[in-house]
């Protein structure tokens, strides 16, 4: 049974009904409808913390989805789950793949920067200042890209860039 039929709260049910109506009246291919259904079910599972189910739905959504923009959000959400699971290398891979299809995802750049910053902090704790500096430099580059796409957002990152003298 599709997840959209088992959601318990009123807002989820209402959103599912509206989405189903839109799927019927907007001219889309069966592949696009299938991809959207899997994507919607993946988002629902992800919001409830059911990451394995969400991943399964997102992977299924990538099969029929051919639109690069829509596919970028599926890949981005897969990256989010891998980040939440502490699988940073996999997360970075999916953020990169999302950005290949849609280079205007500041949140992907931000999340990549957060992972790099975290790895830099780990290197500091391990006493490897050279590796820490490399990770921090990479974090700075990603944050600059996120800020360039959405000036006024990512204020903490902007402040970190200024404090560490990485902002130009």
From Swiss-Prot:
Name it.
Photosystem I assembly protein Ycf3
Q: Which organism is it from?
A: Liriodendron tulipifera (Tuliptree)
Q: Which gene encodes it?
A: ycf3
Q: Which UniProt keywords apply?
A: Chloroplast, Membrane, Photosynthesis, Plastid, Repeat, Thylakoid, TPR repeat
Q: Single Gene Ontology BP term?
A: photosynthesis
Leader sequence segment: none
Transmembrane region(s): none
Cross-referenced Pfam families = TPR_1 (PF00515)
Q: What GO terms fall under cellular component here?
A: chloroplast thylakoid membrane
Q: Record's InterPro entries?
A: PSI_Ycf3_assembly (IPR022818), TPR-like_helical_dom_sf (IPR011990), TPR_rpt (IPR019734), Ycf3/AcsC/BcsC/TPR_MFPF (IPR051685)
């Amino acid at each position: 049974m599709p997840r959209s039929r088992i959601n318990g709260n009123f807002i989820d049910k209402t959103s599912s009904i509206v989405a189903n109506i839109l799927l019927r009246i907007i001219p889309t291919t069966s592949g696009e409808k299938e991809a959207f259904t899997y994507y919607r079910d993946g988002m629902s599972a992800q919001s409830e913390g059911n990451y394995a189910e969400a991943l399964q739905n997102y992977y299924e959504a990538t099969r029929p989805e051919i639109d690069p923009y829509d596919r970028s959000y599926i890949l981005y959400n897969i990256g989010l789950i891998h980040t939440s699971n502490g699988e940073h290398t996999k997360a970075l891979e999916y953020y990169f793949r999302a950005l290949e299809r849609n280079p205007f995802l500041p949140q992907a750049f931000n999340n990549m920067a957060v992972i790099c910053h975290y790895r830099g902090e780990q290197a500091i704790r391990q006493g490897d200042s050279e590796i820490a500096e490399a990770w921090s430099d990479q974090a700075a580059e990603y944050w600059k890209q996120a800020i360039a796409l959405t000036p006024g957002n990512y204020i903490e990152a902007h402040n970190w860039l200024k404090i560490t003298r990485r902002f130009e």
